[in-house]
Structure formats: C-alpha cells, structure tokens
Amino acid sequence: MKNYSSILIIYNPSAMKGKINEFIPKIKQRLLLRFSQVDAMYSANTNGAENLAFKFASKYDVVVSCGGDGTLHEVVNGVMKSGANPVIGVLPCGNCNDVAMSLGIPKKLDKAIDCLLRMNTTNYDIMFDGKEYITYSIATGYLVKSTYSATEKSKQKFGRFAYFISALKCLFKLESIPVTITCDGTRYHNKIAYLMFLNGENAGGFKLVKDADVGNGKVKFVMIKRTNAFINFLTFIKMFMFGVKSIRKHKSVIIREVQNFEIENHANASFILDGEKIKFLKKSVQVLEGVTIIKK
C-alpha cells in the first residue's frame, strides 16, 4: 500500500447551502486517522479553486475537491496545469455531483470520507480543448436547455425530476441546432435535438451509461437528430430513464466511443461544459490520460 501522508481539501464555502464550513473541522479530524498532514482551503472567488490547486498541487499527495462538479472542474484544471500528479479526491457537497456518482462515491458525507480513508484509486481520463480541461461532459440541445431552465427552487423541491418538469415546458420550443461533428475522422453534418460527449456514467443526476470505463482513453458520443418534437421528447425520456443503450437502435440516434472530436457550432448555441453554460463557434477536443482519482 502506497504511503500517502498529506492531503489538501479545497472547498466551496457555499456548498451545502453554506453549512460545509461547519463540517470542515470534523472532516479534518477524521482524515487524521490516515494522513499526518491535513489542510483545508476555501475558494474565495471564481476560479479560486483552480488557483489553489495550481499553487499547492505539488505540495500534497492528495488534493480533494469539496463541492459540486463545478468545483471539481476547477480543481482538475489547476492540478493538470500545474504539472504535478497528486491523487484527486471528491467530497460531493454541491447541487450537481455527477462525477462522484459515476465513481460510486456516496452523497452522505461520512461515507464519502470513508472513501478518502480507503484510498481505492482508478485512472480517470480528461478531455482537453487546447486551453481548458473538461472533467466529464460537454453537451448541447433541447435537453441542455431544459437543464439550465430548471430553477433552484424546483430543484430543491423535486430533485432531479425538476429537469423533467422543465423539459415538459420546453417541449414545444424544441430548437433545431445545425452542427458539424468530426469524430476520429468521421464527419456528421446534422440538425440536432441533442448532443453529448460524456466520460462516466452520470449526467444531470441520471445514470446514462452503465458500467462506463472512465480510463479507457475514450468518451461516449451521443447525438439525437432533430425529428418530430414529440418523438424527440419520448427519446429523451427513454434515455434518461433507461440509459443510452435503450435508444441505440433509434434511427435518429448515433452512439459511439471516440478519442478525438471537433464541434462546429453553426448557430452559436449554448453548451453545458461540466455543468456550466458556455458558448463557442468551434472546439477541438482530445481525450487525454488524465489523473488518478479516488473511487468507492
């Protein structure tokens, strides 16, 4: 067993509606059961977690992201840009914790800490667009619009099913997004209802890819072509209830595993990258052998 002696927790002070600050002393105390040095630092502003990870990654054996997928995105970017190679840990304390779910890390804090104490690790691939590292997903389309249209109030009240409610509201506003996608040399020029590149099992809190291999050098590519609005909606419901395998035979659906891809966004549509809304016209992405990460 490798001797890990130092661990840094980088946490979002807004996590758990601000209550994470009360739990940090308890987290540190439990981690002292295994690590001789346990430190915690909070991200004070946008990109704060990335800056902390970049500055301190080389000084710790383990760097832990404590927050949601957005905090993890920053921590991974800071670590990758630093050139250091600490093990990455995750304490899922945010609104969206897709990566932690894919790794089997429990939402309950005590059990998530148990994972850090066990130090059971796996290789985890990272996508890279030449400037920024993408931890687990990039997506666009109708389903994405319904994701960021879901209000915080509805998410608190209905949980992940808030996205279904939002999707119903967006049903008759379905956009037809013209894109050109090149995947490992194969070119697709289509008007789409949905597009996703995913490393892992979960997106939006739903298990879409069962038993996904997060370290095989490839990511899952899913494209749903724009057809009839109602048919597209039924395809969406089926995918989010039963996973992408359930729609693989649909004529409007393309599913592949890819190593490199390029997206040409002809309509300047909004994308969701690791849970954050962005816009771009063109993006070339490669899948890299990324980090060592703690799993269940």
Segments and roles (model prediction):
Residues 10, 34, 43, 81-196:
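Catalytic core of DAGKc-family lipid kinases
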Residues 175-177, 191-193, 215-220, 257-259:
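A generic structural signal for short beta-strands and their flanking turns/coil linkers
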Residues 4, 35, 60, 191-192, ...:
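Short, well-ordered alpha-helix to beta-strand connector turns
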Residues 139, 196-209, 277:
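Glycine-rich phosphate/pyrophosphate-binding beta-alpha loops
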Residues 1-66, 78, 186-187:
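ATP/NTP phosphate-donor binding region
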Residues 71-83:
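Short Gly/Thr/Asp-enriched flexible loops that form oxyanion-binding sites at enzyme active sites
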Residues 154-162, 207, 211-231:
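Gly/Ser/Thr-rich active-site loops/lids in small-molecule metabolic enzymes
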Residues 183, 189, 213, 223-296:
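ATP/nucleoside-binding phosphotransfer catalytic cores, i.e., glycine-rich phosphate-binding loops
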